[in-house]
Amino acid sequence: AHSMTKKQENITVECVRQVRDAVGPDINLMVDAHGRFDLPQARRLAQRFEEFDLLFFEEPLPPENLDAYVELKRSTKTPIATGERYVARFQFRELLEKYCCDYIQPDAIYTGGMNELRKIAMMAETYYCPVVPHNCNGPVCTAASIHAAACMPNFLMLEYIPVPEREDVLVEPLVLKNGEFELPKKPGLGIELNKKVFKNYIFQPRDLDHFTPAREIFL
């Protein structure tokens, strides 16, 4: 866990203020911290964000210490979301039992598939906890997440990152209209892979700045 300088924190809050002013009060607004902050700074930010009526503050703390999440949640009116880095329903069980957050974010790939995602959602339903599936791994994961979400009574929304250059791995792209995906109706996941383009996506190691200390990458 890391912290920003006071100046960086003030800039962050001002950025959120300007976005809220631009979109108005009726648009859902979320802030994602990628687990960067220590507890004191996460608490300060969550409390300062209260005036902006966020839908949630995503992963303000690293995922390992659930008691820290309990302390954070008790200290703020800003809803908290987390769970994208968990890989099993047993981790989500503890997360839910401790009431660490307001929304959980299981990923169909990281948790072992759409059936496991569905089981996690069923468990969350008993805690009246909405599910916001994490989804940053391309159109195949999106298709799996759509099917799982279709049978989740407590599904809220699906994370979706449009990356046009990755859509060509499908013969027919998924249909997105007015912010909603149409459920594919073909067998299986309802998609067909375009194997001709696989050579364009050979794995290449790379570094992501998602978990780099905030001081090193901020602005």
Q: Which residues are covered by each model-predicted region?
A:
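Structural signal for hydrophobic packing residues in well-ordered secondary-structure cores
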Residues: 20-23, 53, 149-153, 202-205
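Metal-dependent enolase-superfamily TIM-barrel catalytic cores that perform enediolate-based chemistry
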Residues: 1-76
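Catalytic cores of large soluble enzymes that bind and process phosphate-bearing ligands
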Residues: 4-11, 112, 137, 189
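Extended hydrophobic packing segments that form well-structured cores
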Residues: 189-219
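Shared catalytic-loop signature of beta/alpha-barrel
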Residues: 47, 53-56, 64-187
